[in-house]
Structures are given as C-alpha cells and as structure tokens.
UniProtKB/Swiss-Prot annotation:
EC class (word): transferase
Gene Ontology CC entries for this record: cytoplasm
Keyword tags: Cytoplasm, Lipopolysaccharide biosynthesis, Transferase
Database matches in HAMAP family: KDO8P_synth (MF_00056)
Protein's UniProt name: 2-dehydro-3-deoxyphosphooctonate aldolase
Gene3D superfamilies: Aldolase class I
Gene designation per UniProt: kdsA
The keyword Transferase is assigned to this record: yes
Functional pathway: Carbohydrate biosynthesis; 3-deoxy-D-manno-octulosonate biosynthesis; 3-deoxy-D-manno-octulosonate from D-ribulose 5-phosphate: step 2/3; Bacterial outer membrane biogenesis; lipopolysaccharide biosynthesis
InterPro entries assigned: Aldolase_TIM, DAHP1/KDSA, KDO8P_synthase
MF-aspect GO terms: 3-deoxy-8-phosphooctulonate synthase activity
GO terms, biological process: keto-3-deoxy-D-manno-octulosonic acid biosynthetic process
Pfam families (alphabetical): DAHP_synth_1
Main location: cytoplasm
Organismal lineage: Bacteria, Pseudomonadati, Pseudomonadota, Betaproteobacteria, Burkholderiales
Length: 284
C-alpha cells in the first residue's frame, strides 16, 4: 500500500501517526507538528500528524471537545502546507466525511463506530486512506468483515480497495480497563490490510477518573515494543508537551520530550523483526 507519499506494509519500516489528542490551539498544533517532523526525519520514520477537531465521545458532557470542524480543519490544512507533513483526523458522522476528506491525507474512524456500516462505507468511498480502529468490544478476526465492507465501498466508488488500514487499540477487560492481546496484531493481518497499533489508547483506563478517562502512560513503551516485535505496519501514539495540562487524554499521552528516545528504540527493534521475517507463517 502506498499512502501519504510513502510505502506501508510489513516489508517496510513502520510509519508513525502522532500528535496531541485534540487540537487545543494553533500554536500547540504547529509546535508539536514541527518537533515531531524533526524527530522522525532524523530517524527516517515516515510520519503523519494527528489531532482531532472534535472529541465526540468524551466521558463528560462538560469536557473540552475541541475547536470545531471549521477552525480545526483550517489549522490542519495550515499544518500540512506550512510544516510540510501529511495530516490525519477522525470523523464521527457520515456528514463530516466529505469536508474532512477534502483537507486531510488520511481519515480515521473511532473504535466505537467500527460496526456502523453506512459510516464505514462513506469513509472508504472517499478513496482517502482510512485507518479503521477496532472496537474495544470486537474480536480481532471480526475486523475481516469490517475491512471487507470498507473495501467493497471503495471499489464501488471507483477505487481498488487498497486504501484501508486496521488499528488495534486494546480490548475491554472488566470495568475501566483495557488489555492488549498481541495475537490480535497477527490475526488482523487476515484482513489483507496494513495493521497499526495504537500504543497510547491501549493504556487508557476508560472513564477511570469519573468525568474523564485515566491512563497508565508508563506502559506505552512496553506495549509499543511488544507490538513492534510482533510486526506491525504502523504505530499510533498521542503526545503532548505537557500531558498533565492536556485538555484530552493526558494520562495516556507520551511526553513530547521522551518521544526521541522511545522512537529510537522502536526503530532498532523494527529492523530486527522485519529483517528476520515472520516464521509464524510457516506454522499454518
């Protein structure tokens, strides 16, 4: 698969989707995108900047949701054009697909909406690359059907169906907790789509703080290393210069100053994993 100007797949180095959870301000977006571009360029990591114009599934109705679609898309367009990086954002409603697809390089669908057929089809029919997050309630093999819905819609819209990615972000484990079953990364290859691992939402504690979600960011490196050792096409990690002050998902965000060291270790591990191939394919 080729997207955003680079090749994506297990035969290539992992690419990175990263940025603050939500667009808090124009200044934060530009500062974070610029810093991430510097880091990833030095390490040779293909990079897509991510931030949301609206967080439609916050725990509390009083929580900060974002700057809205108009201002948010303007900031993302300016980041893309002025910083010089591809941009990704999530859409939450079918009506948002067309205006968002006109601006961003890749769409992302929230995990909660992975079974909403009309929504998934609309995203895929835009013919933009679409990163479909697996629901916390879904078995990894069920993503085969989700991906097929999207692929069919893309083909019907005149594409070849190769614009779909699938993303693991953990599975519900009782109340207010998630676990990551690393087998799912291999199982989700059965979709025929590149597999992305979301290392920050996987350490989220949904609703764990009552009016907001908690998180255990200290386990982001642990799960990211495990995913890279399994073999993934891409990594998703939210980051913030000061997670304690982040307006959304701060408890599971990677401090921006720690991204270089984390990514350096992951690049080395990715090289080893992909150089040696995937012996599990011979076990079937």
């Amino acid at each position: 698969m080729k997207a955003c100007g680079f090749d994506i797949g297990l035969e290539h180095p992992f690419f990175l989707i990263a940025g603050p959870c939500v667009i808090e301000s124009r200044e934060l977006a530009f500062d974070t995108a610029g810093r991430l571009k510097e880091i990833t360029s030095r390490l040779g990591i293909p990079f897509i900047y991510k931030s949301s114009f609206d967080k439609a599934n916050r725990s509390s109705g009083k929580s900060f949701r974002g700057l809205g679609i108009d201002e948010g898309l303007k900031i993302l367009a300016d980041v893309r054009d002025q910083v010089g990086v591809p941009v990704l954002t999530d859409v939450h409603e079918t009506e948002q697909v067309e205006p968002v697809a006109a601006v961003v390089d890749m769409l992302q669908t929230p995990a909660f909406l992975c079974r909403q057929t009309d929504f998934i089809r609309a995203c895929a029919a835009s013919l933009k690359p679409v990163n479909i997050k697996k629901g916390q309630f879904l078995a990894p093999h069920d993503m085969v059907q989700v991906a097929q819905k999207a692929r069919d819609a893309a083909i019907e819209a005149g594409g070849d169906g190769s614009n779909i990615l699938v993303c693991e972000r953990g599975a519900s484990f009782g109340y207010n907790n998630l676990v990551s079953d690393m087998r799912s990364l291999a199982i989700m290859r059965e979709t025929g789509c590149p597999v992305v691992f979301d290392a920050t939402h996987s350490v989220q504690l949904p609703g764990g703080q009552g009016t907001s979600s908690g998180g255990q960011r200290e386990f982001v490196p642990v799960l990211a290393r495990a995913a890279v050792a399994v073999g993934v096409s891409g990594l998703f990690m939210e980051t913030h210069p000061n997670p304690a002050c982040a307006l959304s998902d701060g408890p599971n965000a990677v401090p921006l100053d720690l991204m270089p060291a984390l990514l350096e270790s992951l690049v080395e591990l990715d090289r080893v994993t992909k150089r040696n191939g995937f012996v599990e394919n011979q076990f079937i």
